[in-house]
Amino acid sequence: MKLTSPKQRQGDYYETLAKGYLEAQGLTFFDKNWHYKNLGELDLVMLEPTQKPPCLVIVEVRQRKASQFGTSLDSITPAKQRKIIKTTAAFLQAHPQFDTFDIRFDVVSYEGAVIAGKAVTPMPTWIKDAFSVN
């Protein structure tokens, strides 16, 4: 995928950071930016293989430079949650090997601006089970 806009490059940067962070926590990477037609996109699809039964972890990655409009977690509205859940249903239809897996929806968020010219790695906040299918 060609990243043309600054927003796309920023999103890719934080998704890559989140992927590395989650792998360091024991999750296994499966896919990034999985999308289905006009339905939506899943930022990261990870596996938690040590859990019994194994767990498919759908990860929404968020970042906000400033919090005057709320935190990055606040931006995951009920409508956004429904979109992620519907996209996950399409993902499961395309990947029947995960039919027996538990499904979990996590969020990895980053707050604050990147400091230009500084080698600063933002610290993630990882919320397991951030929302559920209900």
Roles of regions detected by a PLM:
Residues 85-97:
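Metal-dependent nuclease catalytic cores in nucleic-acid-processing enzymes
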Residues 94-134:
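Domain-level recognition of nuclease-like catalytic cores that cleave nucleotide substrates
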Residues 64-88:
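Mg2+/Mn2+-dependent nuclease catalytic core
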